[in-house]
């Protein structure tokens, strides 16, 4: 009986330790992962099988938690970095939509050219709102300043078109995380929603890193000084 109680107490202590590590942040999780990896590498031949199983399970759980933490940190960093650009791109897309809607009402609903432009603007607005939180935001309305990295620009343009195509498909199928109608009501992506996802494109990731200066140029192209003042009020 006493032996069983000691086992339960040890298991409880191990669970409590894991819980504390999980809540301690990315750096502590990384340190614990390294400790467990070293332990299993050096003493796997002499450790009891029950201990090995427990440590391997802990290691697997910690690696998963590390991935989740790093993903959350990436989402948080992207949200902070691209919030202003996305804010003004949404504003610009809404203005385009309202202008086109007014023209259609004035000229009639049979104007196919205006209808196509209206659809394109709807797609753009859905793009801004549903763009994945885990990726560097690719501006819809970038500046025309000549780039020193033409290949990077080409890959970025391709990635943008891929997302626009996916948005159009999801919009037509009514499977967007946030629909066009919901966007007009002010809805955004839920906190636990990442947004749209495409298959990884490593060539793009390697070639499309944008400096803060380039990000700033994109923002300056999207908005004017008066609008920037509105944002900070």
From Swiss-Prot:
One of its GO terms (cellular component) is preribosome, small subunit precursor. Residues 26-109 form a coiled coil. Residues 194-233 are annotated as: Disordered. Disulfide bonds: none annotated. Transmembrane segments: none annotated. Its main location: nucleus. InterPro entries: Efg1 (IPR019310), EFG1_rRNA-proc (IPR050786). It is found in: Nucleus, Nucleolus. Keywords: Coiled coil, Nucleus, rRNA processing. One of its GO terms (biological process) is re-entry into mitotic cell cycle after pheromone arrest. Involved in rRNA processing. Required growth at elevated temperatures, resistance to hydroxyurea and for cell cycle progression. Belongs to the EFG1 family. Present with 2840 molecules/cell in log phase SD medium. This is rRNA-processing protein EFG1. The lineage of its organism: Eukaryota, Fungi, Dikarya, Ascomycota, Saccharomycotina.
């Amino acid at each position: 009986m006493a032996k069983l109680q000691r086992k339960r107490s040890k298991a409880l202590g191990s669970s409590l330790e894991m819980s504390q590590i999980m809540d301690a942040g990315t750096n502590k999780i990384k340190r614990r992962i390294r400790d467990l990896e070293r332990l299993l590498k050096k003493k796997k031949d002499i450790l009891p099988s029950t201990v090995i199983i427990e440590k391997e399970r802990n290691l697997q759980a910690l690696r998963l938690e590390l991935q989740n933490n790093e993903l959350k940190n990436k989402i948080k960093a992207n949200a902070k970095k691209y919030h202003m650009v996305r804010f003004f791109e949404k504003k610009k897309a809404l203005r385009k939509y309202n202008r086109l809607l007014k023209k259609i009402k004035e000229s009639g609903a049979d104007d196919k050219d205006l209808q196509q432009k209206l659809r394109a603007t709807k797609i753009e607005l859905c793009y801004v709102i549903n763009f994945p939180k885990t990726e560097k935001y690719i501006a819809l309305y970038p500046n025309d300043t000549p780039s020193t990295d033409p290949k990077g620009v080409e890959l970025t343009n391709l990635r943008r078109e891929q997302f626009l195509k996916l948005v159009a498909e999801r919009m037509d199928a009514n499977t967007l995380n946030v629909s066009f109608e919901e966007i007009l009501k002010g809805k955004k992506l839920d906190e636990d929603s990442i947004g749209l996802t495409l298959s990884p494109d490593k060539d793009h990731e390697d070639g499309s890193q944008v400096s803060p200066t380039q990000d700033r140029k994109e923002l300056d192209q999207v908005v004017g000084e008066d609008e920037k003042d509105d944002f900070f009020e």
